[in-house]
Amino acid sequence: MQTLRDVAVGETVKIVKLHGQGAVKRRMMDVGLTKGASVHVQKVAPLGDPIEITVRNYALSIRKADADMIEVVPE
């Protein structure tokens, strides 16, 4: 299982599953991180947190902990 946290800068992946429950999962879905969405990793901060991604044509920064909950496959 590859998570969004494992994706290298410049790669594009597709979301296959969101882990997590309740408000955390709902928040991720509200910002466009849904099953089947294409995600491009733009950059990662020096200490690895946060991760800047592009999803549905807008930029988004997420924490490492949130990126660990997003299961992805290469596009």
Where are the regions a protein language model picked out?
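Absolute protein N-terminus
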Residues: 1-2
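Short alpha-helix capping/helix-loop boundary micro-motifs
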Residues: 24-27
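C-terminal structural segments of small proteins and small subunits
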Residues: 45-75
